[in-house]
Amino acid sequence: MKRVAKRSFKPVFACLLLPRYDSAGVKIMLKIQLSIRIERPYVGLVSRVWLRQAVKLTLVHTGMSSPVELGLVIAGDDTVHELNRSYRNVDSTTDVIAFALSERGANAEPFITPPDDVIHLGEVIISYPQAKRQAEERCHPLERELALLVAHGVLHLLGYDHELPEQAEKMRAMESRVLDTMKG
């Protein structure tokens, strides 16, 4: 079995407080603990601010109000290919893989919040080279493709899926809402 190349990046942690309003119009703060790791060849090619914004907007548009923690990795094709092969039995690279720490969604067991009240969502891994290829194919900026992939991965962590047409439509609509509100 081929080993995934040793990662040559260090994580950068951010704790974000994002104002939100509940159904009664009361202001609440959404706490997001976000770890962003970028493999060495891609450092400087990706804006951490842009990635954080994509995560925040995705959580806002889904109505998330509980404190959350998640990781985001920008990696190369080799890393993503190996993860895809190891965990999904697909022997090719892909654009984004999400590893949820708990089963979420309509048929999932109720989620028990840990003592720190932070919901540990999981990790999203994006292939920078694949994102770049897709941006070129779709004739839009790489930043837009990265925001789309961040939103897609975070939605998977929250239990969204695209196996059925109605699920895919709901997920695409949510991704579009995120992209429409991205500023840059």
State what each model feature region is.
Residues 2-147, 155-184:
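An acidic/histidine-cluster motif and surrounding catalytic segment
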